[in-house]
Amino acid sequence: ADVRQYIADGVGELCARYAVDGIHFDDYFYPTTDPAFDAADYAASGSTLTQDDWRRENVNALMELCHAAARRYGVRFGAAPTGDPEQNYTLQYSDAARWLRQGTVDYLMPQLYWGQEYIKNGDASHSFAQLAAAWAALPRAAGVKLYAGLGAYRVGAGDGSDAGSEWFS
């Protein structure tokens, strides 16, 4: 809780000291799926949640505090979760769907870094079209925006798709 408050205080300080219109969290992901990483903290918390849900609730609490800190100054707050909603939830412990639904963020910008025709091992579930549709289908609180995060670094480099890559042209 102290670390969460420290980060939220930092968000507030940025908003108070600098003429910013928004605060954007990028690559804030949970550092590992290894249960040992925070096992002692989890045990000490006495939580009745599973360790995975406890991790998600910690991230949710951080996001809520930071959103409140930014909004105190009229500053927008948002984040760029990984592009795959399921991976975001299960491997990054970030319940971005909840943030959209509850208005924990003013906007979400999923990292949709795959091409329109992305196919890997016969699976097109990570194509831009599939993932953009999955995010767009999630319920959003009034006023919460959804933006597509694009990976400009892919231009000329491709995305490893079995179907070729429109990033080359």
Outline where the language-model segments fall.
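Loop/turn-rich, solvent-exposed surfaces of beta-rich toroidal or solenoidal domains
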Residues: 106-119, 123, 148
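Active-site clefts of carbohydrate-active enzymes
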Residues: 74-86, 132-169
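Short, proline-enriched alpha-helix->beta-strand connector loops that line the catalytic pocket
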Residues: 103-105, 144
